[in-house]
Amino acid sequence: GKAAMVLALQHPDLLRRLIVADIAPVPYDHTQSHQIAAMRAVDLSNITRRSEAAEQLSAQGVEPALQSFFTQSLDVAGKQWRLNLDVLEAQMDHIIGFPEVSGQFPNPTLFLTGKDSDYVLPEHRPLIKSLFPGARFAKLPDAGHWLHADKPRAFEAAVRTYLDA
């Protein structure tokens, strides 16, 4: 989401419209390092199925929707995560930050958020509207920040509706 926003703001001519999933163009102070730690805690040496990794993630306190989402990034045969957890951890400050950028993206933009998420707050809307004057907002019920993992069918339906309009 943040990379797509930066692209849209720096090169608005490259995009006709934009969908941003539960993130605002602001720096955040909470990290996802605990999720990385949970993934690192999984003993991959004896894993033969994703469900076994999901069980270990559950023991680390990872909620079911994220267990499924994270285990999609598991190379079971290779006994490794496809994600570079070291780089994600090392770059967390950049991941949770947002660069100083100028410009606007005037084209239609959907900010799709989870109703139970606190990532896109009402106080972010003036900034969002100043950078993305064509912004519209929609919320997925019963979804948090990881809305595509929490409610994949509802997420897909909202995206399709927006793109088909």
Each language-model region and where it sits:
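Flexible "cap/lid" loop of the alpha/beta hydrolase fold
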Residues: 5-50
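Conserved serine/cysteine hydrolase catalytic core
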Residues: 77-131, 136-139
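Catalytic active-site module of serine/aspartate enzymes centered on a nucleophile-bearing elbow/loop
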Residues: 134-165
